[in-house]
From Swiss-Prot:
Assembly notes: Heterotetramer of two alpha chains (FadJ) and two beta chains (FadI).
High-level lineage: Bacteria, Pseudomonadati, Pseudomonadota, Gammaproteobacteria, Enterobacterales
Ranges for region Enoyl-CoA hydratase: 1-190
Keyword Isomerase: yes
Name of this protein: Fatty acid oxidation complex subunit alpha
Presence of keyword Nucleotide-binding: no
Stored Pfam families: 3HCDH, 3HCDH_N, ECH_1
Length: 714
């Protein structure tokens, strides 16, 4: 049976060949291996028809040009040689497109990423729509890879090496106007005339080569290139701690091509692509990609979600303001904020205004669009306008009686269909619902701070929550741009429960005399974005430690903080960055706030002279092993539904190193037996809190894993 082609050729009356990209049965266009022959066949037809004056590539999809290559192709490769051959095939197809003697133009609307941008780079000209959906980028580094179809060679020659490196090393995506300014596209036009404009560009002949700015010409020369790559190499090493081999290989491949020419660069690119595809880091990063993609299809319960037409938020504080913003500005849903004080409503409105206005200043948003989005948020000090709200998200103080009163009031002023979603971080949802008339409509929806930045939410049904309420809240979280995981209604839920022992162990290391900055450096070296002590400062020491007594009450001694360390810090009015006094001191210089460890912390904790006695590896081992042990307990107690959810929760919720794939994939990689052995060694050295849980001991004995065997390979 023949595969339905994703590429359709039509020659217009003006002799411009339009190749329409439309992957059959797929929402997104992605490049698959079998498309290679289809493209080659069309290129051959164009080449053989001497009357054709130009070619335009355009997508039939409503919101994407080509979103990248199909990652499953890489997962199916069983050796570096197979992956290298895949890259060479991509390079050859792009070379055939670029080799056409007539103008080839890419007409881009929507996502143009990875292999999609590499195809556009192989064209002689690029024109894109001015739509907000239009994004151009090479995000392969986020999968532990590099662009493998010529992108490492074509992009630096088109826009300059420094801008190209920034895009490839970070995966940063450019909007239409940014792409125009960078020289990545030749024109930006309204979507309605995109095809017409691309045809006109093709009829003009090949676009002239862009004059590179003087700075980029200098950086492309031998001396400038040497200085640039030396500087960027040091900078990326500091940021990645050597944990992401793709970063180093991108630098090597780009430099090789600039120094020795395109042919050498293409060969090195394909070889590096093959090597990187087989690294454990890429396999782990791809597993996160597959897991998060899988979660997008997960409804959370065996039920259809209810309607989502309007939402309400109780509380205009930091969390309430952030929740209102993502609901209205990301989710496109009208929001009504209720606060007992007008200043609370004003605070929440200002929160959204400031975020939107920042986008206007950065020219990412038009003032008219800012005003339209702000008009979707309203406020009141009473329940006016609440009657028909589908979901009411509660973001008031962590006080059980107060939250129960909120449930009662919402049931009084809202319809029977309204779902009450509590943004609690510590209180059992079953307790909040205990006095409800409609307990089936009560659920937990735990956001992380700052709401607009943190991608994860925990959805927490209690035993009596309706399946439809679960599905509706999961759908709402997705509308808000979040990745939701459904977790059980037990103390700490999942993320805070695995985070607390990690933080507590860092505090114990501090009490033992390890310097604040050395503890943080050790965990950053391990792969966390920030260390545990800095994390406490960022979240707020008062906020971040509220959960610990709750966990200690529920699970006992293993959650107790050492020697009242937190009490001593809080009594000295140290709340972290929010009052510029925590374990670090913060000085505002220019736009950025610089931090330095505060030596006054040590006497507060009874520490005479802090001194590093342990290696970075030993410090990291103690903190991380406490987290892994607790994660295994959560798995056994079915706090999470699967290893997939546990890995996504840890990576998206607390920054567990993505290149390790999450705590469960990491434990599977090193083996339950090895994890248990390390914990037993630490227990002998430091005490019973490190005793491996029964789950790990059982898995070690049976040789089993958290992830099913067939899912561990992706």
């Amino acid at each position: 049976m023949d595969t339905v082609s994703a590429f359709k050729l039509e020659v217009r009356a003006d002799k411009i060949a339009v190749i329409t990209i439309d992957a059959p049965g797929e929402k997104m266009n992605t490049l698959k291996a079998e498309f290679g022959n289809q493209v080659r066949g069309l290129i051959r037809q164009v080449r053989d028809d001497k009357s054709v004056r130009g070619v335009v590539f355009i997508s039939a999809k409503t919101d994407n040009f080509i979103a990248g290559a199909d990652i499953n192709m890489i997962a199916r490769c069983r050796s570096a040689q197979e992956a290298e051959a895949l890259a060479r095939q991509g390079q050859q197809i792009m070379a055939e497109i670029h080799g056409l003697s007539i103008p080839v133009i890419a007409a881009i609307h929507g996502a143009c990423l990875g292999g999609g941008l590499e195809l556009a780079l192989a064209c002689h000209g690029r024109i894109c729509s001015d739509d907000e959906k239009t994004r151009l980028g090479l995000p392969e580094v986020q999968l532990g890879l590099l662009p493998g179809s010529g992108g490492t060679q074509r992009l630096p020659r088109l826009i300059g090496v420094s801008t190209a490196l920034d895009m490839m090393l970070t995966g940063r995506q450019l909007r239409a106007r940014q792409a125009l300014k960078a020289g990545l596209v030749d024109e930006v036009v309204p979507q309605a005339i995109l095809l017409q404009a691309a045809v006109e560009l093709a009829l003009k002949g090949r676009p002239a080569s862009r004059d590179m700015p003087v700075r980029e010409r200098v950086l492309a020369g031998p001396l400038g290139r040497h200085l640039l790559f030396h500087f960027v190499g040091k900078q990326t090493q500091r940021k990645t701690q050597g944990n992401y081999p793709a970063v180093k290989r991108i630098l090597q491949v780009v430099e090789n091509g600039l120094a020795h020419g395109c042919s050498s660069g293409y060969a090195e690119e394909a070889r590096a692509f093959g090597e990187l595809a087989m690294t454990p880091q890429s396999q782990a990063l791809r597993s996160i990609f597959f897991a998060s993609t899988d979660l997008k299809k997960d409804r959370g319960a065996e039920a259809e979600p209810g309607p989502l037409t309007s939402i309400a938020v109780l509380g205009g504080g930091l969390m309430g303001g952030g929740i209102a913003y993502v609901t209205a500005c990301k989710g496109g849903l009208p929001v009504r904020i209720k606060d007992i004080q007008p200043r609370g409503i004003n605070h929440a409105l200002k929160y959204s205004w400031d975020l939107l206005n920042k986008q206007v200043r950065q020219r990412r948003l038009r003032p008219s669009e800012r005003d339209r989005q702000m008009a979707m948020i309203s406020g009141a000090t009473d329940y006016q306008g609440f009657a028909h709200r589908d979901v009411v998200i509660e973001a008031v103080f962590e006080d059980l009686a107060l939250k129960q009163r909120m449930v009662s009031e919402v049931e009084q002023y809202c319809g029977p269909q309204t779902i009450f979603a509590s943004n609690t971080s510590s209180l059992p949802i079953g307790d909040i619902a205990a006095q409800a008339r409609r307990p089936g409509r009560v659920i937990g929806l735990h956001f992380f701070s700052p709401v607009e930045k943190m991608p994860l939410v925990e959805v927490i049904p209690h035993k009596g929550t309706d399946p439809q309420a679960i599905a509706t809240v999961v759908q709402l979280a997705k509308r808000q741009g979040k990745t939701p995981i459904v977790v059980a209604d037990k103390a700490g839920f999942y993320v805070n429960r695995i985070l607390a022992p990690y933080i507590n162990e860092a505090m114990r290391l501090l009490v033992e005399g390890e310097p604040v900055e050395e503890i943080d450096k050790a965990l950053v070296k391990f792969g966390f974005p920030v260390g545990p002590i800095q994390l406490l400062d960022e979240v707020g020491i008062d906020t971040g430690t509220k959960i610990i007594p709750v966990l200690e009450s529920a699970f006992g001694e293993r959650f107790s903080s050492p020697a009242n360390i937190i009490d001593a810090i809080l009594k000295d009015d140290r709340k972290g960055r929010k009052n510029n006094r925590g374990f670090y001191l913060y000085e505002t210089k220019g736009r950025k706030s610089k931090k330095r460890p505060d030596p006054a912390v040590y006497p507060l904790l009874g520490i005479d002279r802090p001194q590093s006695r342990l290696s970075a590896q030993q410090v990291a081992e103690r903190c991380v092993m406490m987290m892994l042990n607790e994660a295994a307990r959560c798995f056994d107690e079915q706090i999470i539904r699967s290893a997939r959810d546990g890995d996504i929760g840890a990576v998206f919720g607390i920054g567990f190193p993505p290149f390790l794939g999450g705590p469960f994939r990491y434990m599977d990689t090193i083996g339950a037996g090895e994890v248990a052995a390390i914990l037993q060694r630490l227990a002998a050295q430091y005490g019973p809190r490190f005793t491996p849980c029964d789950t790990l001991l059982r898995m070690a004995e049976q040789g089993t894993t958290f992830w099913p065997a067939d899912e561990r390979l992706t």
